[in-house]
Amino acid sequence: MIEFDNLTYLHGKPQGTGLLKANPEDFVVVEDLGFEPDGEGEHILVRILKNGCNTRFVADALAKFLKIHSREVSFAGQKDKHAVTEQWLCARVPGKEMPDLSAFQLEGCQVLEYARHKRKLRLGALKGNAFTLVLREVSNRDDVEQRLIDICVKGVPNYFGAQRFGIGGSNLQGALRWAQTNTPVRDRNKRSFWLSAARSALFNQIVAERLKKADVNQVVDGDALQLAGRGSWFVATTEELAELQRRVNDKELMITAALPGSGEWGTQREALAFEQAAVAAETELQALLVREKVEAARRAMLLYPQQLSWNWWDDVTVEIRFWLPAGSFATSVVRELINTTGDYAHIAE
């Protein structure tokens, strides 16, 4: 299995270094649900601003304040502790008057707004996230500038970030140990983390191998293509390759890579043979996903940061702003810009 740091680069390995997250204010994330609260219902959506505390910790504190069980507080996604983040929490408080959430106090956390909502906020139920990052001590401004220009046109690999695999790769190591035994894993969180790490690692490996091709965005027979921003896909046939290539070049269609699991992967013929060969050595992880009935799926191979802009504060400091759809990793963008340094260089979303 290829280590995250050794995955293939789309724009070549960065020539310079830089410091990511010298302080939490250098990494700002604003969650975009893609909808507004209903204004009525048994749930309360709470928009919070936090710094120095993780999402689960804040959710548990909110549950305690509202005198409800912690399982009654949900969120669309985890946000990093070592960053300044805005996100929504959802508390189920049926048949009660609206509590005064302005009285909720927690160090490093502030309630920005709250309103009633009809439905529970479920994991993954967000449109995306807006990022504002500050890279400091940049050693090669010209290289970073050119890479930002290139990313506007060609995007970046849609890799799962290193944080998906746990500190020191612990989640992936757990998956490998589990794959080598038939011992049931009772802990639901461990099951989820380990299976997710296994599937994400296989996806990254497939993308890394595809990026070694001369023309990364060349459609081949049997590729699974999806409309940009959509989840469904269709299979490319030889007769359609020229027209499909035009639509991929126009960013109307995206080439996808497999999230291996049980069932068909989605590709056929040449594309399927390539994907299977890319992860042929990872038989244990593939068998684990099939054994645990994790359904195969697809994910876009490349990621195009939206609304990408940047501003150099000086020759060694740049502020970068962009928006990414849900499930994408800001660190996969930064990775194409600089070789990061700092204690939290890999911890982002």
UniProtKB/Swiss-Prot annotation:
GO terms for biological process: tRNA pseudouridine synthesis. It holds the Pfam family TruD. It comes from the Bacteria. Residues 155-303 form the TRUD domain. The active site is at D80. GO terms for cellular component: cytosol. Keywords: Isomerase, tRNA processing. Its EC number is 5.4.99.27. The keyword DNA-binding does not apply. One of its GO terms (molecular function) is RNA binding. Gene3D superfamilies: TruD, catalytic domain (3.30.2350.20), TruD, insertion domain (3.30.2340.10). It catalyses: uridine(13) in tRNA = pseudouridine(13) in tRNA. Substrate binds at F27, N129, F329. Belongs to the pseudouridine synthase TruD family. Responsible for synthesis of pseudouridine from uracil-13 in transfer RNAs. This is tRNA pseudouridine synthase D. It comes from Shigella flexneri. The lineage of its organism: Bacteria, Pseudomonadati, Pseudomonadota, Gammaproteobacteria, Enterobacterales. The gene is truD.
